[in-house]
Every structure is written in C-alpha cells, then in structure tokens.
Amino acid sequence: MGLESEKADVQLFMDDDAYSRHSGVDFVEAEKFSASGPDRDPHRLNSHLQLGFQDVIAEPETTHSFDKVWICSHALFEISKYVLYKFLTFFLAIPLAFAAGILFAILSCLHIWIIMPFVKTCLMVLPSVQTIWKSVTDVVIAPLCTSVGRSFSSVSLQLSQD
C-alpha cells in the first residue's frame, strides 16, 4: 500500500513549438504510470494544488521575455518543483504521517471515550433538568415578574412645563 513497484522515467522536453502547451516534465510512458497503482487522492482533497507554470508565472502580451529564457525558466520551475517535492516528502512524510496519526488517535479517543459519553449523559439528564427548571420558573421567577409588572403598571408619569 503506497509502495512504488516501478521507477518513473522522466524526460524534459524543451522544443520551441511545444513548450506552451506542455508542462515541461513528463513520463516517458504516461499511460503506463497513470493507469497503474491506486489513486492516492480518490476524494480529490488536493485538487487545488495542481498548478502549472502558467498558473504561477504569466507574461502579458505587451511584455515578453526571450523565448529561450521562457522555455528555460519553465523547465527549471517544473524540475525544481518535482525535485524539491520529492526531497521534502523523503524527509518529512514519515514524521508528519506519524504525528498526524498520533493526533488523530488522540482526538478519536477523546471523542469516543469523553465527548460522546458526556453529550449522551447531558441529553439523558436534560428532561429531568427541564422539569426542574420549569418548576423553578413557575414557583420563583413567574410570581416575581408578575409582581414587578403590577408594581410598574400602576406608576404614571405626568410631565408639566413650568
């Protein structure tokens, strides 16, 4: 699960007429690598991270650099993105996966053994609390509010201009 059984052969294309519609880095046999292996993002959680060179760097029609500079910068962008991602995942993927596993295990344990029993207990006790609260409001708060209302209803103010 997640282990690579084949090595990916990578080629860099830098021909003048195909650079604008090509991503720069490509698999030698793209159909072999796209069809094999499980989908690592089946729910498309990281579909927003599929950025290309044109999504990051763009030159308007009025200002263009030399074609060779554009092609080389495109190739360097794609290669550095590819190599740096591989380098970072080589060093960070296992420790971060371990830390995320610990975090999710702790959160799951807290949710299962503390939060949900507390919520269920509150929901179970709630009808009793509701009955007690209704009795307290009927016995204490309702007469108090009624007497205050009657006291203030007999107050009348008259303003006179002297």
Curated annotation (Swiss-Prot):
Subunit architecture: Monomer or homodimer. Interacts with CAV1; the interaction forms a stable heterooligomeric complex that is required for targeting to lipid rafts and for caveolae formation. Tyrosine phosphorylated forms do not form heterooligomers with the Tyr-19-phosphorylated form existing as a monomer or dimer. Interacts (tyrosine phosphorylated form) with the SH2 domain-containing proteins, RASA1, NCK1 and SRC. Interacts (tyrosine phosphorylated form) with INSR.
Keyword Cell membrane: yes
Reported function: May act as a scaffolding protein within caveolar membranes. Interacts directly with G-protein alpha subunits and can functionally regulate their activity. Acts as an accessory protein in conjunction with CAV1 in targeting to lipid rafts and driving caveolae formation. The Ser-36 phosphorylated form has a role in modulating mitosis in endothelial cells. Positive regulator of cellular mitogenesis of the MAPK signaling pathway. Required for the insulin-stimulated nuclear translocation and activation of MAPK1 and STAT3, and the subsequent regulation of cell cycle progression.
Record topology, Cytoplasmic segments: 1-86, 108-162
GO cellular component: caveola; cytoplasmic vesicle; focal adhesion; Golgi membrane; nucleus; perinuclear region of cytoplasm; plasma membrane raft; sarcolemma
Organism: Echinops telfairi
InterPro entries noted in UniProt: Caveolin (IPR001612)
Gene: CAV2
Chain positions found as Phosphotyrosine: 19
Name this protein carries in UniProt: Caveolin-2
Annotated membrane topology: Peripheral membrane protein
Positions bearing Phosphoserine: 20, 23, 36
Family: Belongs to the caveolin family.
PTM statement from Swiss-Prot or TrEMBL: Phosphorylated on serine and tyrosine residues. CAV1 promotes phosphorylation on Ser-23 which then targets the complex to the plasma membrane, lipid rafts and caveolae. Phosphorylation on Ser-36 appears to modulate mitosis in endothelial cells. Phosphorylation on Tyr-19 is required for insulin-induced phosphorylation of MAPK1 and DNA binding of STAT3. Tyrosine phosphorylation is induced by both EGF and insulin.
GO MF annotation list: D1 dopamine receptor binding; molecular adaptor activity; protein kinase binding
Membrane-spanning parts: none
This protein's UniProt keywords: Cell membrane, Golgi apparatus, Membrane, Nucleus, Phosphoprotein
One GO BP annotation of this record: positive regulation of dopamine receptor signaling pathway
UniProt subcellular location: Nucleus; Golgi apparatus membrane; Cell membrane; Membrane, Caveola
Intramembrane segments: 87-107
